[in-house]
Amino acid sequence: MPQQLSPINIETKKAISNARLKPLDIHYNESKPTTIQNTGKLVRINFKGGYISGGFLPNEYVLSSLHIYWGKEDDYGSNHLIDVYKYSGEINLVHWNKKKYSSYEEAKKHDDGLIIISIFLQVLDHKNVYFQKIVNQLDSIRSANTSAPFDSVFYLDNLLPSKLDYFTYLGTTINHSADAVWIIFPTPINIHSDQLSKFRTLLSLSNHEGKPHHITENYRNPYKLNDDTEVYYSGEIIRAATTSPARENYFMRWLSDLRETCFSYYQKYIEGNKTFAIIAIVFVFILTAILFFMSRRYSREKQN
């Protein structure tokens, strides 16, 4: 059978729940972005340090780079779909098997050489302060085939979703140059429309007329599943077939992100405007209480 091409649409009702898929050990605390690139097709950030292990992985996979995809509109832009639902954008984190292979180029020749983590982007009505650190770098790479040092303190852990259950399948890299095992987090992270629109101002490679144009979209449409392709899920499939797991409880995720924003304001103003800092931390406590009671309510609903 031919290799399964990526991306794909994940049908949650057909995913195989596998209790042996343990939580991933994600070690991004030592990862540092070195450069950011406009390849003419996408935004790429190169990293030094950081790795993943645990779960079903045989050993450590070292973080290599981050790729970002988007669409013309905020309603679509992700490569992968969950129950035919397309998100606003998608982040791909590319890792390679350093323990088994001597280089990334060598690793990509083997079906156990690459692991790609997928994080969905969902546009809501407030900014993501952590994603903004990437947005702030885009002016330095507006032209195609340009790169620049990533000159801001950036912690990749802050871009991980609130829930780390995952789907996984064996596919290919997005450009189909190599096999890759995909790990897809169905819970998205939220960003603002203005943040995503900034990516559409980047310039691509020259067109047939010799003129560069804006990269208004760069996502790929999904490929049909091969008959022998199996998608596994690290949790229990308890949702209705028509319900996407990533679309559940948007309000709770919005409150969670709002709480993080309030806490960042508290840290920013605690040494200056103490009144503003106190107001921010009060909101943090209030939002924490609301999230606690809402999570208990949703848990009871699922049990029923």
State each model region's role:
Residues M1-N304:
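Alpha-carbonic anhydrase
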